[in-house]
Amino acid sequence: MIELKGISQHFRGAGGTDVHALRDVDLSIDKGEIFGIIGRSGAGKSTLVRVINLLNRPTSGTVTVAGQSLTALNADGLRQARRKIGMIFQHFNLLSSRTVYDNVALPLELAGTPRERIREIVLPLLELVGLDAHKDRYPAQISGGQKQRVGIARALASQPDVLLSDEATSALDPETTRSILDLLRKINRELGLTIVLITHQMEVIKQVCDRVAVLDAGRVVELGRVIDVFLKPRHDVTRALIGEVISQELPPSVLARVESRLVAARERGGRDHLFRLAFTGAGVDQPVLAQAIRNYGLDFNILHGHIDEIQGQAFGSLAILASGESADIDNAMHFLREQGVVVEEINHVV
């Protein structure tokens, strides 16, 4: 659906220095998926989303949407192509002098759409976003979440194939954010719309996205299914972003107890191992730890744990201290991996 190949974007910065906002980005986004792009401030994510509809023309590379090369189009062709790409923003950009209905109708009016046809398009959209009862209200009379719903309906008015969302929930409280994400998921499901969602919040990615690309300094440093990225983050930036949602670090009080335990093990010539386990799907429901303990005669001390949900799928993370013979611990970890558990040794003491 969307193909970005070799995308680089350079700007002339203060003092005449070159700013490399994007560096050789390759992305392929499938039709009908919700694709997340996440990164810290300055990572290049907002530049990237504006490259998709060529609001920013890349310094190099090609942009293809629905089989059409946007970078090869002239001004008129690009204007037509953009009608199939809707966009919502962090700031709602509503006209205060127009009602909810009229704000949604605005792009259709500008395109010269007949009045009756506008009505046929706008009223179902207002019902879809839950604002049919507020169509005659003005922006000052509705909440921030409702304003964003107006922005979403307006972006859908041209009946696009792609919806770009640039930090659309960043200015909203957590409860309103969840309701907007639920709405985007509903739109994706009912309209078959491809959604590209830009955010700096991993919680947003966790709730709604099918796949995610992690940007750092203008480069894609990690790419994959959201559940896989949470299970096996490879890049430090990804780990840090996930850590804001699901703590990957042991609390200080737990660390102090672990250090005492490891020191005692060293003094008696024992061997304790510290592991982080991540599991999902059936692994959450099955007693795999109990089986490992029984099968290999080990002691597992659960130090820290967290269970959450990603796209309706259970996800768990545990930090455990394993005590026993080295060979038995190795065999137990092999057994857990065979059950689909992701095993990472944090530290060990001989």
Swiss-Prot record:
* The reaction(s) this protein catalyses: L-methionine(out) + ATP + H2O = L-methionine(in) + ADP + phosphate + H(+); D-methionine(out) + ATP + H2O = D-methionine(in) + ADP + phosphate + H(+)
Alphabetically ordered keywords of this record: Amino-acid transport, ATP-binding, Cell inner membrane, Cell membrane, Membrane, Nucleotide-binding, Translocase, Transport
Location relative to the cell: Cell inner membrane
GO cellular component, alphabetical, reads: plasma membrane
Q: Which residues form a coiled coil?
A: none
Query: Where is ATP bound in this sequence?
Result: G39, R40, S41, G42, A43, G44, K45, S46
Q: What is its main location?
A: membrane
InterPro entries assigned:
AAA+_ATPase, ABC_transporter-like_ATP-bd, ABC_transporter-like_CS, ACT-like_dom_sf, MetN_ABC, MetN_ABC_transporter-like, NIL_domain, P-loop_NTPase
- What residue stretches are annotated with the ABC transporter domain? 2-242
Keyword Amino-acid biosynthesis found: no
Q: Name one Pfam family in it.
A: ABC_tran
Give TM segment ranges: none
What's its EC? 7.4.2.11
Q: Which cysteines are joined by disulfide bonds?
A: none
Offer an example of a GO molecular function term for this protein: ABC-type D-methionine transporter activity
Q: How does it sit in the membrane?
A: Peripheral membrane protein
Give the matching CDD domains: ABC_MetN_methionine_transporter
The EC category is translocase
SMART domains in the cross-refs: AAA (SM00382), NIL (SM00930)
Q: Which PANTHER family match?
A: AMINO ACID IMPORT ATP-BINDING PROTEIN, METHIONINE IMPORT ATP-BINDING PROTEIN METN
Family classification: Belongs to the ABC transporter superfamily. Methionine importer (TC 3.A.1.24) family.
The entry's function note states: Part of the ABC transporter complex MetNIQ involved in methionine import. Responsible for energy coupling to the transport system.
**What is the annotated quaternary arrangement, including any partners?**
The complex is composed of two ATP-binding proteins (MetN), two transmembrane proteins (MetI) and a solute-binding protein (MetQ).
Query: What is the name listed in the Swiss-Prot or TrEMBL entry for this protein?
Result: Methionine import ATP-binding protein MetN
